[in-house]
Amino acid sequence: MRVRRCAIVYLEPRERLGFDLDGLLAGGDGTVRRQQWLAHAPHLDAPVPIDAPARECLGQLSAALWVDAACLAGWPEGVLDWLLARGLALAEAEGQSAIADTRLREDYWWGPAAMFHRAGRWSGEDAAAATEAAGLATATGLRQHLGPPPPAVAERCSEEGRLRLPRGQASDFDDLLRRRTTCRNFDPARALPILLLARMLERAFSAQAQWRLDTDTVFLKKGSPSGGGLHPIEAHLLVQRVEGLAPGAYHYHPLDHALEPLPAPAMPIPELARVAVAGQHWFAGAQVLVVLAARFGRCFWKYRQHPKAYRAVTMDAGHLSQTLYLAATDLGLGAFVTCAINEVDIERELALDPLGEAALAVCGFGWRADAMHNAEFDPAGRTWATPMA
């Protein structure tokens, strides 16, 4: 059997402080320090606690070259089997960990980006409940518990030293920008006409043109910019209330301007919508939710193990969400975007590979409700006449 180390692994000395009453009574300060080494490998679902012998042996393995296990006879007994069982060392015969590790290598991930991406994923989180329980659901609660925030504006000189610029004459586009706001109140009963759904998808995600170098090398032109012109973000829809369209999961085809029905998720769509946005019920009721899923291999094909590539992909998601906002505002619809999502649950339900095509954010759009039951940030009162709570 030949073995090697996984492609990417980082070691963390994690420290936890606790209180020990006996230590305090004995004359100490009562502080107990507990330290544990963790191995973080982005092809694994969770960090692995690791002891000193395993840590040292793991560092001796090459991540690139296979070595015969017989050459490791001098290792402490059981260490190689322990590393193999946990996916930190890999045997040449493929297992599940080896398949995920191969995906990392083939898609040219930059190590720190892969680590960041995998470590920040949620499963089963209810961000809304946690925020409310902590008293952080309102601006008043935020300030009360966290103190005042840093200033809203960074100032680099005195007021007298600023060079005032002329204000432009407002146009229809200026009005559109001023009306753009995040919707937290969707109509729970009204269905969206399929023509509006089609218009939204066409504006936000469709390919306006394409350029072919060869049959296997195609570049798309869309309404939003993309790093390297590669457009790695895919739109996966959770349709809840659209006239003439069955509720379910769909993938949008940007060239054909068509929906591709996906296998039915195990969760009912309304439940999946709420889980997807981590319990943010004010978003979960949108007529249509859009999972922005990144095909990292599309971007990393050009930007191989590049320190800026992951940042470019996340910027793409931001560009698309703003285009979706403006399209919705122009059509009289509400819209939202959130990165507080349960990626693990989304990817499981939609059969997405967390390293190959992973959820980065969830957008949504649809009809606004007649009344504002959930507070919205609309200080100028362009959407609601009701003052902010």
Indicate residue ranges for each PLM-predicted region.
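Short hydrophobic alpha-helical module
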Residues: 203, 207, 258, 293-299, ...
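A general structural signal for short secondary-structure boundary/capping elements
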Residues: 281-287, 295-298, 334-341, 381-388
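Hydrophobic alpha-helical transmembrane segments and adjacent short intramembrane/lumenal linkers
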Residues: 264-298, 305-307, 312-314
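Short histidine-centered catalytic/ligand-binding loop motif
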Residues: 181-191, 301-314
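Small-aliphatic-rich amphipathic alpha-helix that forms the alpha element of a beta-alpha
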Residues: 200, 235, 288-290, 296, ...
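Extended hydrophobic-aromatic, low-complexity segments
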Residues: 261, 300-302, 335-336, 373
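N-terminal accessory segments that position/regulate proteins before the catalytic core
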Residues: 1-280, 287, 349, 353-389
